């Protein structure tokens, strides 16, 4: 055993992701407006002794959708059941989940936009009427059977709200958009994570990690662990700004959080397509990445920074994108032509 405060015992290392998750709304950092509203809805449901209305969390990945769903179940004092859209292949799979719920339980479906349309049809009466309509048998002998369900709360999570069918989206009484975090909020996330992991960190170190975390708590937690590795091997007693800067530079994460893949994306538009427009399928092929990765992982933060624009003709590099690459737009392109308002 070592006295180095950066070292953790085996029990501390085990399941660090779960250990770092906040357990209550009071512990949850950021999303102040959404959090305050959820507190009201939870208290109202508890006072009425009813199941809370169905909730839809939407926004970029890594902002706390799953964590908030777990917190809702915990604060309601009910069971938490979790699954994901692609896993529920058949209507029977969903029926098995729903019929095993107890009064007030929370059923969490991640990537709910990827539900099979046939499964969605079964979900509609379950959400609205607390009932399950099933067809038993085939052909002339087939008959419809309605099974009553206990009151429950469905919580859906999606990074692609626009892909949800309107009838499904409209059945969620509590839609909640999650926003990217500010640097100050991420500093608190990093400081809290370091404390829970038994890592010493000063304000400069927390700020450096926060600035490069893409506005996303999940990224902040991942970078914190990697910086801890560098600090530990260097024999440092705590993470400072210089240690964090050195570690993140070696990990090829730049000053505003862009990684190698982000820079490849920007460089491809700038060098090969002269700033765009260029189609997303072309970019996906050039980067050897699926379209979903481009649209859900790479682009949201670049759009948030004002570096690219999604237009009807394709992706275009904005002035800030050119500036970040240290390049000037082609002479034929007017400054600001593809600005954020396009």
Swiss-Prot record:
Gene3D superfamilies: 1.10.8.60, P-loop containing nucleotide triphosphate hydrolases, Winged helix-like DNA-binding domain superfamily/Winged helix DNA-binding domain. ATP binds at residues 20-21, 62, 65-67, 171, 181, 218. The keyword Membrane does not apply. Residues 182-252 are annotated as: Small ATPAse domain (RuvB-S). DNA binds at residues 291, 310, 315. It comes from the Bacteria. GO terms for molecular function: ATP binding; ATP hydrolysis activity; four-way junction DNA binding; four-way junction helicase activity. Mg(2+) binds at residue 66. Residues 255-342 are annotated as: Head domain (RuvB-H). It is an enzyme of class 3 (hydrolase). Keywords: ATP-binding, Cytoplasm, DNA damage, DNA recombination, DNA repair, DNA-binding, Hydrolase, Nucleotide-binding. The RuvA-RuvB-RuvC complex processes Holliday junction (HJ) DNA during genetic recombination and DNA repair, while the RuvA-RuvB complex plays an important role in the rescue of blocked DNA replication forks via replication fork reversal (RFR). RuvA specifically binds to HJ cruciform DNA, conferring on it an open structure. The RuvB hexamer acts as an ATP-dependent pump, pulling dsDNA into and through the RuvAB complex. RuvB forms 2 homohexamers on either side of HJ DNA bound by 1 or 2 RuvA tetramers; 4 subunits per hexamer contact DNA at a time. NCBIfam families: PRK00080.1 (NF000868), ruvB (TIGR00635). Homohexamer. Forms an RuvA(8)-RuvB(12)-Holliday junction (HJ) complex. HJ DNA is sandwiched between 2 RuvA tetramers; dsDNA enters through RuvA and exits via RuvB. An RuvB hexamer assembles on each DNA strand where it exits the tetramer. Each RuvB hexamer is contacted by two RuvA subunits (via domain III) on 2 adjacent RuvB subunits; this complex drives branch migration. In the full resolvosome a probable DNA-RuvA(4)-RuvB(12)-RuvC(2) complex forms which resolves the HJ. This is Holliday junction branch migration complex subunit RuvB. It comes from Novosphingobium aromaticivorans (strain ATCC 700278 / DSM 12444 / CCUG 56034 / CIP 105152 / NBRC 16084 / F199).
